[in-house]
């Protein structure tokens, strides 16, 4: 069923179930494997898992479709959509930060600011007003259990209140969170709720304000509510984070009595930030009251208080800073009203405001420094005069006490001149102290007002509202105290939630592994509050306050010295400011500025000013300063705090109490109070720092959740057993659920609980049994409470039934006694009435009193004596009473005197005791301070000794280290020198080697020449010339060869250098091209990803479209079937209607004839005037009905026209959508074919390219081998090659990435075959671009081949040069041998240096490897820790899921049992119904037989009547004879006529009663038949609905199987595609290797590639345009999909409506059964009455026989009437002629009516087509029609009443007509004729009734709306006929005025019966239709 629509205030409390139970979201979640991944913007972002590789996961972001690879530890699970906006986050299946944040964000954006997190509640500040705090909402939450209502602060308050009353344990509600998170507002809501729920004057609230001691009704609650506005005005201010920030902490203690009513309250405050009164930061305000006063004061008040404008006050640093949506003047009036309600007098209010004004005026006092001295002066004392006027002190004394105060020096008192700074400080200190004292006085006054009641408080509920955690730009002493308090509260939360909870599990012996959540805040708390070893911040601050020369800088330095190594302490990074330090709080790092901390801690005041204020003429000011106790400049308010807080415990007070110590003691006391209560935590969260509604900063919220321990609290709530109850209490409370489980007699509580739990069949995982308590998981106790409530209601109902039965029996017995007593009284009265006239009784009554006279006189004397005695006793008693009263008054006076004395003594004793305690406390405190100082001095001495010893050790260590450093430095310098010398020697030797090589070369050349010459000279001197010639030739030749070789060598080197340059250039260009290609590929990949995404979306849309088309086809089939069925029914209905119309026409004809006869008889009796009046009334009614019918027909036709138009529009839209989808499908098929062709072409091109690549690769390998030979000989070439290899490696990685992208693209390309036509055009463009690229690649390959040919030619030249080089190298090798020898020596020399350096490097490498191993191990440890945590979380979630599943299984088993029971009950009920139906059928058969027998008896009676009439005729004839013979008998004629008339009247009345009984019998039979028809129709409808539901279930099952099969086929296709992709990947890897070889050659095509790049960029723009078009198309598809979803939802709603119709039909069937039983009872009573009436009839018929003898005497009077009857016959003939003409016109109208019916039939067929679509929109019109039906029913009832009245008048007229009828002679003849006609009419009536029953049987099968509409149409069609018949009837009445009648009573009564039957039938038909319609409408 659809959810009931939520009201405006419920929208912010309840979750919309339609949003949560969205099947599309569930399907999306399950299909996409959605998870949470970290996000910088949103904290966490939704993504779907695409691929898993070991510990890494590739995910696709849902928002932008971007793919990201992350570690598994960084991913968090996502909950199913049904857990969206869950009210308790402990119910989440996957508990992690992302899920908690998402749930809070969803609820926050829906206006749901409260969320349960296990045992506590999380509140997010909405920054706007929500309508969830009204009295209606309070009533909703009052007394409700937590799980029965959504989360709310009222639920927390109610839980605490009920726990306090039930457990008798003090409760506390702790609102914690940062500043601006909403703590104060929630505190106010708690107080508001308690004031309403726990009010002791409910229903008697009085709004009057009383100032006396007596309470008005509800005054305490009103005062409790008004305390907050007063304290907020004086203690709250606007900060950067919060417009209403509490600048003090408060603990509101509300006391309750035993019955739960509020009996009083008390408020304790902590650390008012009084420095705000004199100075504020930028954009901040001081306390509200200053602005309220200036803005809201009246003119007279401004004059009295000397008020000025905002900008005229120095203490208002920023002037007037307005607060949005708040008016200061209105708030001022509210504050004054609150003060009045609290009982503040007018004088007190003005005094308070005077002090506030004086504080402002203090800031306007200006001091100046005198020229020659530092002394301060006050040149203008106007402000001082105003201050003194307001405070009631002397101006001169005030200025003297400020400028030259008197101070005590030793024993002397001297005046000391103050500097300007000191005077300013004194004024500011005075202003702060004045405001603080005023605030404390107000608090005391409020507490006094709240604690006036004399009732004793049994328990209390505390509400803590303390300033939240604060991090400002400048954080001072107040922020430290506030943050310290929040640390303590958070520690209390952690201790309560985690430590105490688990310790209790261990104490109770429950199996539990202790979990350390790592949330201990004790280190930070100890850093602040630790007294010694080492001292904390507060202790060091107090210590510094002792020293006169101490400064804030020295305090910070000492703090750094003591706590510098603390984990939670850090030095400030700003080196300039030496008064700053940092503390790492749980909520973040806070930098504190310690400026003026010593002053704030000591809080000094000017004694002269305070004494002056103490002596003020203003009583209020003097009271503020009367109890100042000042020692050594430290402000102390001991007396005031003791007197002002009577309920507070008297803490240690005395001298030298600093602000820090006082606050620490207050906080300790508060924490003790909170630990003694049962805390209820409310965690307030600030969503953003801009104070904007509807914005949530995810990281800010996450940080607060982490700090507050929300996740850990939820986890321990889920894993643990948070609900626990003592054995005895469990048994006492829940024994009712397992009544027979515990045997009688004594049994141990634990054993009893075990037996109870077994009887309750609880899952063992849901509870644990401890030593003294039984523990439950969350929700179990709530379930038990629900079952207990149900059981108690059953018991109470049974008890109430017993009580009612007992009372009924008692009342019955009393009635019986009364009845018997009444009978006795009646009997006695009857006897007395008989006796009172009896003479003996009268004598007895007279004599008996005389016998008692003597005894009465004796009794009277005895009574007089007794009366005298009682009077004497009374007088004695009165005298004694007076004496006792005198004694009592004396004793009371003595008692009062003694009480006064005792009171005075007790007061004296109390004062003395108080003084003694105070002195003792001061003494003890001074002693403690002394001991502490001595201990500190000793500790300081020990510490200093230790430090000195450590210092010596450190100095010794420093010396040792310095020596070691010097030695190492010396060794290092030696090594450096040795290294330098070695380097010099090496260089020198290298130079020597070069010189020697040159010399060696020269020497070898010279030696060769000399040897040649010597050999030539020695061998042959003769041939010297020839040899010389040959040598010269050879020399020339060699020289030419060498020169050629040198030239070639230079050329080769130049060419090599040019090649290397070209190579580098090409490499640079190739890298640029690769980058561009990578960018293009990335863009292509993004486009493909977008295409894939669009494909998926399109597939989803197509799938939805197919589902919707199938649903639409099914719906159309059903519509066609229904239409055919409706058309058949309509045809049957029309035939039945035709028959019914004919029958009605005949019926009307008969009625018209009867009416005509009646009018004729009435005309004879001169009743024409009355008839005309009746006719006029009827005509008016007819005209009114006509108008109503016409209006209804017009409205109906208009509605039909509208529905027809809407239906045609809907059909046209659906046809258009179908055509669009068909076109889209055709386009998709076309694009699929084109894509397949393109894919084939691309595959062919890739094969050709791969072949070309292989050829190029072979050539490249050959070249690389040759190049390697060359590069191995040259070191430069080796470096270049290594660089190239690195670049190649990078390119390989890039190519691998490209191939992986290509693989992905190919896998997606396979899916692209099913895509949209718009995307196909884009693909075609991209394919054209690819073809162009391939052509360009072919051009590049051809160019590469040309370059390779050039390279081959160059290579051949190179080979020749290499051979020449080899010859040269052989010569060089001899020289290299000599070089190697010298190098060996050099190596031996440098070996020693290298060994040392290698050792050093080895050590460094070992250190680096160790550090690397350590880092790797640390990283692996962190990773393992993360995985462990993640696995632990998953395990916890799985355990919780397992528990939930077990619970679900148990619940399902229980539901199965209940379902079986219900099924059995339903079977029993159906069998009962079958039995009842059989019994009803049997009864109906019996009644039919009875009716037949009665009909036979009626026929016999009629026959007897005819015989009597015949005998009557004979007797009349005899009477005539007798009359003619005997004339003297006529004297008694008149008397006989009278008696005869009376008898005939009686006979007629009996006949009418008999006829009415017959009519009732007929009506009962009709009702029986109608009920049977209804039953049959209901049964057939029910069977049809069951069959339809079975068909729907079967259809759903088939669809699910089809979907499963489709998913399996898709999975198989996916597997095949993966296999194909893997093969393609391997192939591509091979291709990539081939491509790597072509990289160098591809570099030469750079310029062409740049051109292609430009083309690609232009094409990319085109792609972008196409992409935009595709997005627009996608949006259109999404729009159509959304419309289809809406239509699907509408169809679902219609299905639900049909189910509801079925249920309503079932209810109607039950109602029909009840009506059937009632009809049966009425039929039985009618039968019994009918038998009695038949007996009476027989008796009357005998009497008639006697009277008929007397009728013969009346025939003499008949002759006079015969003439009149003849005239009437003539008039009747004329009327018959007119009737014939009217019948002809009626026939014409009948033909016109049939034509209209045909038109209506066509309209109905169209209307039935539209009914399905218009059904939901027609509810309002249905309601209007129902109202019309009700009005028509009322009209029908009125008409029925009028008919009954008319029937009565007709009966009276019938009686009058009897005299005339008796005188008519021809009555018998006409009676026989009309009797025949009546019999014919009865036969016709029976036929008509049978036809009507059949028509009703058919019509009741049609549903309610159709019946309603058909009924209106029928009425519209019958309107013309009805009008025609009305006219005919009226004419016949006018014309048949004088027609003679022979036997009118039977005919008339029969006619009336016909009319009554007709009207009854019509009414029953209308009732039946209305019942059906109402049944359907209720459905």
UniProtKB/Swiss-Prot annotation:
Residues 30-80 form the Myosin N-terminal SH3-like domain. It holds the Pfam family Myosin_N. ATP binds at residues 177-184. Residues 667-689, 768-782 are annotated as: Actin-binding. Residues 850-1979 are annotated as: Rodlike tail (S2 and LMM domains). InterPro entries: IQ_motif_EF-hand-BS (IPR000048), Kinesin_motor_dom_sf (IPR036961), Myosin_head_motor_dom-like (IPR001609), Myosin_N (IPR004009), Myosin_S1_N (IPR008989), Myosin_tail (IPR002928), P-loop_NTPase (IPR027417), XRCC4-like_C (IPR014751). The modification N6,N6,N6-trimethyllysine is found at residue 128. Residues 792-821 form the IQ domain. Residues 1130-1150, 1709-1736, 1891-1979 are annotated as: Disordered. Residues 850-1979 form a coiled coil. The keyword Ribonucleoprotein does not apply. Keywords: Actin-binding, ATP-binding, Calmodulin-binding, Coiled coil, Cytoplasm, Methylation, Motor protein, Muscle protein, Myosin, Nucleotide-binding, Thick filament. Residues 84-789 form the Myosin motor domain. It comes from the Eukaryota. Residues 1135-1150, 1968-1979 have a biased composition (Basic and acidic residues). GO terms for cellular component: cytoplasm; muscle myosin complex; myofibril; myosin filament; myosin II complex. Gene3D superfamilies: 1.10.10.820, 1.20.5.340, 1.20.5.370, 1.20.58.530, 3.30.70.1590, 6.10.250.2420, Kinesin motor domain (3.40.850.10), Myosin S1 fragment, N-terminal (2.30.30.360). The rodlike tail sequence is highly repetitive, showing cycles of a 28-residue repeat pattern composed of 4 heptapeptides, characteristic for alpha-helical coiled coils. Limited proteolysis of myosin heavy chain produces 1 light meromyosin (LMM) and 1 heavy meromyosin (HMM). HMM can be further cleaved into 2 globular subfragments (S1) and 1 rod-shaped subfragment (S2). Belongs to the TRAFAC class myosin-kinesin ATPase superfamily. Myosin family. Muscle myosin is a hexameric protein that consists of 2 heavy chain subunits (MHC), 2 alkali light chain subunits (MLC) and 2 regulatory light chain subunits (MLC-2). Muscle contraction. This is Myosin-11. It comes from Gallus gallus (Chicken). The gene is MYH11.
